[in-house]
């Protein structure tokens, strides 16, 4: 424990917070162009084929971004909007694409949790 003299002489230094979304340069989203589309298998207790896109951002950085939802219409050279947010069972994938913006179509079959997948509200006939 520090004495009161030591506390007055040396102020405590703040811990630096590590930025995990460096490629976005502090922005909420960035535009990018798909270079490659691939599937990755998740970490151990899980088993699936997760869709991942290799994206070159407008900042010239190349990242891997997860494509959420079932099915997608992306192809190489499609323009996407990328946000931060890691996929827990895919190591090294720290970004997600935003559905329903630019060239990435929304998940049309969704009825619940539509805002995360860019789906419009279905028309109700009365």
From Swiss-Prot:
It is found in: Mitochondrion. The keyword Flavoprotein does not apply. Residues 1-21 are annotated as: Disordered. Residues 12-21 have a biased composition (Basic residues). GO terms for biological process: translation. GO terms for cellular component: mitochondrion; small ribosomal subunit. Pfam families: Ribosom_S12_S23. The keyword Ribosomal protein applies. One of its GO terms (molecular function) is structural constituent of ribosome. It comes from the Eukaryota. Residues 1-11 have a biased composition (Polar residues). Its main location: mitochondrion. Keywords: Mitochondrion, Ribonucleoprotein, Ribosomal protein. Belongs to the universal ribosomal protein uS12 family. Protein S12 is involved in the translation initiation step. This is Small ribosomal subunit protein uS12m. The lineage of its organism: Eukaryota, Sar, Rhizaria, Cercozoa, Chlorarachniophyceae.
């Amino acid at each position: 424990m520090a004495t009161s003299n030591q506390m007055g002489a040396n102020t405590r230094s703040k811990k630096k917070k590590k930025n995990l979304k460096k490629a976005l340069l502090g922005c909420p989203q960035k535009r990018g162009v798909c270079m490659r589309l691939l599937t990755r298998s998740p970490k151990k207790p899980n088993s699936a084929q997760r869709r991942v896109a290799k994206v070159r951002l407008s900042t010239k950085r190349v990242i891997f971004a997860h494509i959420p939802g079932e099915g997608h219409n992306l192809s190489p050279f499609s323009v996407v909007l990328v946000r931060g947010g890691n996929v827990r069972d895919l190591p090294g994938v720290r970004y997600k694409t935003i559905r329903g913006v630019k060239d990435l179509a929304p998940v049309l079959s969704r009825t619940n949790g539509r805002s995360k997948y860019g789906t419009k509200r279905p028309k109700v006939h009365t």
